[in-house]
Amino acid sequence: MPESQGVSPGAESQGVSPVPESPGVAPVPGLPRVPSAAEPVPPLTSLVAVPDDPGIARLHALVAARRDEMVALRRDLHAHPELARTEERTTRVVADRLAAAGLQPVLFPGTGLMCDIGERTDGRPRVALRADMDALPIPDTCGEPYASTTRGVAHACGHDVHTAALLGAGLALADLEAAGELDVAVRLLFQPAEEVQPGGSIGVMAAGGLDGVGQVFALHCDPKVDVGRVGTRIGPITSASDEVHVALRGPGGHTSRPYLTADVVFALGQVITQVPAVLGRRLDPRSGVNLTWGSVRAGSAANAIPASGTLTGTLRCLDVRAWEAAAEVFEAAVRDVVEPYGVDLEVRCQRGVPPVVNDESSTHLLDAAVRDVLGPDAVVLTEQSLGGEDFGWYLTRTPGSMARLGTRVPGGHTYDIHQGDLRVDERAIEAGSLVLARVALLAGRR
């Protein structure tokens, strides 16, 4: 673990920007509307009743007391998104708020931070709670008054919600610690760079983020699930994901004489269409292998065959064993497909992330935490997705579980992540804070 770079309570802070008033975005006819920034966010109790258990009711009260603050903080982060490994402002905002609560955040090299709450007793390990903080290089089209102020960058995957929810959970746990009511040791992990391969989690582990940790938990926004509900799954919940790069070179020339060229455009077309089919014959189809191209670049003139072209994409597998073999199989398939065309080839498979494989015991704890704070019907079974998540690297070191936090207005429009129009029901922040705090309490008492 690096030497502490704690932020003092008196450190200068940019604070949270005030949210301008606005009439908001016109609702879709016939669908419930997400409240605009000019309107207060309804309390979570508009969806779920506060439990009778005194301890859980107290946790509800502590989280609810900061509802407006955490919503404002989330909107501030949404308005000021930062790409992977540049989350300097986000790190300062979170660190300053933790320091103001009397805590001692420790900055990671570059960006991101961790913060311990409570003391380890009897040699018991800490429980880690993780949120990612980075945004995406996508224009923000959500239409909210707190939309991104950074051109071409948006919180289109809900990491602003993750950050606010974890901060709310951490402050509630700090309240319990200050009152002498916290009997578990917790570590908050505010992680940078989830959206780039192989992910910021590797740097967090290298900096000692999992040292002394026995279990780790996280939530990820799911706009297909109603707010107040959480999707859980034992075993793999995401896929493995690698980035692939193909570059072809050869003699270019006039389009009237392709036989005098290597025609890299035609060869690229063969790679695009044929390699996915080849993979389906060389890898077990039950592994759910999926090759999807994201970019193709070649040429600039209609009557000239270019001398070079490139492809990039993602290679995903549901099964970790297939993932371990996929890079070699992919590279061989590309070479076999382009061999007849006489082009020079460079092919690279950049290792990304393994599947997130949820530990059974940890997932049962998450289920219990969700039911405790959100009600007996709040847990829903979720499917394994083809999305990648670098939380999977943590689970190669430490048992844990990730769940999907519902963000959809009940009965409302279903948005999707990695799209600039993503909008969330901000009651999810309060729900996420409660679930994270409660699972830490349950896990620490085992």
Segments predicted by a language model, with ranges:
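Intrinsically disordered, low-complexity proline-rich tandem-repeat tracts
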Residues: 2-45, 54
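Metal-dependent amide/peptide-bond hydrolase catalytic core
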Residues: 40, 44-47, 51, 100, ...
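Acidic/His- and Gly-rich active-site-bordering loop/insert found
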Residues: 41-155, 160, 164-184
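Divalent metal-coordination and catalytic microenvironments
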Residues: 77, 129, 159, 188, ...
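Active-site beta-loop-alpha junctions enriched in small/polar residues
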Residues: 82, 132-134, 193-195, 222, ...
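Histidine/acidic-residue-rich, glycine-tolerant segments that coordinate divalent metal ions
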Residues: 112-114, 136-138, 143-154, 160-161, ...
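Non-cysteine beta-strand/loop elements that form the S-adenosyl-L-methionine
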Residues: 128-130, 139, 244, 402-408
